[in-house]
């Protein structure tokens, strides 16, 4: 049945934004079961995508990911294939793909059981780590005059910094300076480019910089993932040491060569090099990725107390007051900003809080998440138009105005999922987090890899007759090629959360999970996607509480049956159904029934379809829409996406807005009918003479939003 969900713009009180965290401690309430303890099983789209990703990861030549480092540090590059895409020798973002490659190797290793595959993945990580340490050690230069090793602060004194250039000729010269970079610098880009950001040099691949600290973050993240996920002590220890030394280089540079001053105008703030207020507020050039996240994580991993304190201090150096301070007050500072430049900064704020930072960091993350959910999302869970956050509540205006599929950058989905997972740790009883995680995972992330050969999306097309722009066959090709290499080997990372004596089932996936603290192995048996799942103890027994997510879309027929007895006589969608602490044994069978309910996910903004569907006008509010209607004798409409449970159902074969009309019966409750499926894919349905498939299955053009009739009327 179709149920109507009207997402009209609403005013949200500041107090709501300040609640979210269920305790005052920096420690999370729950943690996800480690990636190495959960396996997605069976034959389904999830395992097919995962296996395709692993085959691709193993097919890439590790030497291609080392070329730029060897070149930058004056080492022999013979035998190394030339890198490609954004890692090619003529780009200033080189190294970003190498960082994603290390993360993908580590994630695949943690989620893999096959000994031969694990050995192959491990050998590549060993090669990467050994080579990167060799490069880094070339910066360990003792200066007799200074009586110490050269440090980051010594590189490019201010007079020299003011004269530095960003041309390719200068770039090649700076590559010869590796002995002057300062102890610990590791990057495929010369240190000059981190320094040039202190001079507020703009984004320009020809004459200035791209995003040097973004690249540093990708490398730190890859090394930290190896250190965290790999059980080979020699490799993980070396990876951590490389990351620690680079993190301390960042601390040293920003501690002594930068400052923070928000007073005055932009011109006066830029009169002196190194004002972080301006550095991190620059478009692209000031993009730092998750530097704050990685440095905060490092601060919790290293053994030396002084190093830990410095790394956390360095994390705070990446605060962006222009972006953070309004969010901390509950004000929307999102619109008009580059989406994937800023989502990772918010992830960093939350990790800073977890590492011991102030409560404001938690509030920044929570407020940002709430704003995005209420004001900027598409039905798929993605955000953005041409990589930007546009004005709030204007998704349809942006979608319709876009002439190409420049919507919903895949990196944004990757990072919003990460932020959601991290927030869920602090308030795991709030089902909104895993409802959203399910939405973006099932609709965008799973569908962002071509099902029969490895290629992943950059933008993820949403709109009228929209086709996913397939490409990105390696993590070097683009930012989304990098996150795409990681996405499909970690579907299970947020399936289960645990505390001392409670397990939260956040996702219904065919899986096996080991909860070592309780000495039990849980088995979840279901199809994917699932309308019914059975959870059993495969090994062990124990006393604990189990909480099962009741999805927001489970408005009819939801039930929980323990050993055949129904427990859910009452339930609330978007909540957790709790089975209080009891002794669980291998004889128990827990069945979750959650029939998919069709509903309309309405877009928040009104649009007017003009004659012959050749143009659209967008009204900012109901009054303006009414005036527009009266002047043109037209009715404003609210577009909507047809949902079946958590799945966006995309319409096949619609080419224009005249065809993109979905009529609901007078009672508003028609049901999808199973349709003949010539492609042999499950989940093909018909409604109102149109054919719909789950969007994750789409590999040709489909339409996501339709003109819903029997809905909005202005009176």
What are these language model-derived features?
Residues 2-11, 17-20, 564, 586, ...:
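Intrinsic disorder/low-complexity segments
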Residues 22-115, 153-177, 191-231, 275-278, ...:
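Aromatic (Trp/Tyr) and acidic
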Residues 116-201, 376-387:
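Helix-terminus loop motifs that line ligand-binding clefts
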Residues 241-355:
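Hydrophobic, small-residue-rich alpha-helical packing segments that form membrane-like cores
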Residues 365, 434-443, 448, 452-536, ...:
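C-terminal beta-rich recognition modules with glycine/proline-rich loops and embedded aromatic residues
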Residues 544-547, 579-595:
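C-terminal beta-strand-rich structural cap/linker in extracellular carbohydrate-active enzymes
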Residues 555-580, 600-606:
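Solvent-exposed beta-strand/loop surfaces of large extracellular or lumenal domains
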């Amino acid at each position: 049945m179709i149920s109507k969900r009207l997402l009209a713009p609403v005013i949200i009180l500041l107090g709501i934004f300040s609640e979210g965290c269920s305790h005052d401690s920096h420690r999370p309430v729950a943690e996800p079961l480690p990636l190495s303890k959960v396996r997605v099983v069976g034959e389904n789209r999830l395992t097919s995508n995962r296996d395709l990703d692993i085959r691709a990861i193993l097919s890439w030549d590790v030497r291609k990911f080392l070329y730029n480092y060897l070149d930058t540090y004056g080492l022999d590059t013979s035998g190394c294939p030339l890198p490609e895409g954004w890692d090619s020798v003529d780009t200033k973002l080189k190294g970003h793909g190498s960082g994603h490659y290390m993360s993908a190797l580590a994630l695949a290793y943690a989620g893999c059981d096959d000994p031969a595959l694990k050995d192959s993945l491990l050998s590549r990580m060993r090669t990467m780590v050994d080579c990167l340490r060799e490069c880094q050690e070339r910066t360990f230069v003792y200066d007799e005059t200074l009586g110490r090793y050269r440090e980051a602060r010594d590189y490019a004194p201010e007079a020299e910094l003011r004269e530095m250039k960003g041309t390719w000729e200068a770039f090649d010269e700076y590559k010869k300076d590796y002995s002057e970079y300062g102890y610990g610098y590791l990057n495929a880009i010369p240190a000059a480019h981190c320094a040039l950001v202190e001079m507020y040099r703009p984004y320009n691949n020809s004459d200035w910089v791209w995003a040097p600290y973004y690249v540093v973050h990708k490398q730190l993240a890859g090394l930290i993932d190896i250190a965290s996920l790999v059980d080979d002590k020699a490799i993980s220890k070396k990876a951590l040491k490389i990351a620690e030394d680079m993190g301390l280089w960042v601390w040293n540079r920003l501690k002594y060569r930068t400052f923070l001053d928000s007073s005055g105008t932009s011109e006066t703030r830029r009169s002196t090099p190194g004002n972080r207020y301006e550095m991190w507020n620059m478009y692209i050039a000031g993009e730092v990725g998750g530097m704050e996240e990685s440095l905060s994580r490092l601060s919790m991993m290293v053994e030396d107390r002084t190093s830990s304190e410095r790394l956390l201090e360095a994390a705070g150096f990446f605060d962006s007051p222009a972006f953070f301070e309004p969010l901390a007050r509950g004000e929307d500072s999102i619109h008009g900003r580059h989406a994937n430049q800023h989502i990772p900064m918010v992830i960093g704020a939350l990790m800073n809080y977890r590492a011991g930072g102030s409560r404001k960091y938690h509030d920044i993350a929570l407020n940002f998440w709430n704003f995005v959910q209420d004001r900027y999302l598409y039905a798929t869970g993605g955000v953005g138009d041409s990589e930007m956050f546009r004005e709030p509540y204007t998704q349809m205006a942006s979608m319709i105005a876009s002439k190409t599929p420049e919507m919903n950058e895949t990196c944004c989905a990757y990072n919003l999922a990460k932020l959601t997972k991290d927030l869920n740790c602090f308030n795991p009883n709030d089902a909104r987090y895993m409802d959203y995680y399910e939405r973006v995972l099932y609709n965008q992330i799973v569908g962002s890899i071509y099902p029969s050969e490895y290629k992943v999306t950059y933008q993820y097309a949403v709109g009228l007759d929209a086709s996913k722009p397939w490409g990105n066959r390696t993590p070097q090709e683009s930012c989304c090629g990098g996150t795409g290499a990681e996405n499909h080997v970690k579907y299970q990372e947020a399936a289960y959360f645990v505390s001392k004596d409670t397990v939260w089932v956040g996702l219904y996936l065919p899986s096996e999970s080991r909860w070592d603290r309780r000495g039990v192995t849980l088995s979840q048996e279901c199809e994917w996607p699932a309308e019914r799942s059975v959870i059993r103890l495969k090994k062990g027994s124990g006393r604990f509480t189990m909480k099962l997510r009741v999805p927001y879309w489970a408005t009819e027929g939801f039930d929980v049956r323990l050993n055949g007895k129904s427990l859910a006589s009452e339930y609330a969608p978007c909540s957790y159904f709790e089975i209080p602490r009891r002794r669980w044994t291998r004889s128990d069978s827990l069945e979750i029934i959650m029939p998919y309910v069709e509903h309309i996910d309405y877009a928040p903004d009104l649009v007017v379809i003009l004659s012959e569907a050749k143009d659209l006008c967008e009204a900012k509010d109901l009054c303006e829409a009414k005036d527009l209607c009266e002047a043109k004798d037209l009715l404003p409409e609210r577009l909507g996406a047809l949902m079946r449970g958590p799945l966006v159902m995309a319409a096949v074969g619609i080419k224009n807005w005249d065809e993109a009309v979905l009529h609901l019966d007078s009672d508003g409750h028609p049901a999808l009918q199973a349709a003949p499926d010539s492609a042999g894919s499950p989940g093909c349905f018909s409604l109102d003479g149109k054919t719909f498939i789950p969007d994750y299955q789409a590999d040709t053009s489909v339409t996501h939003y339709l003109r819903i009739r029997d809905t909005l009327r202005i009176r």
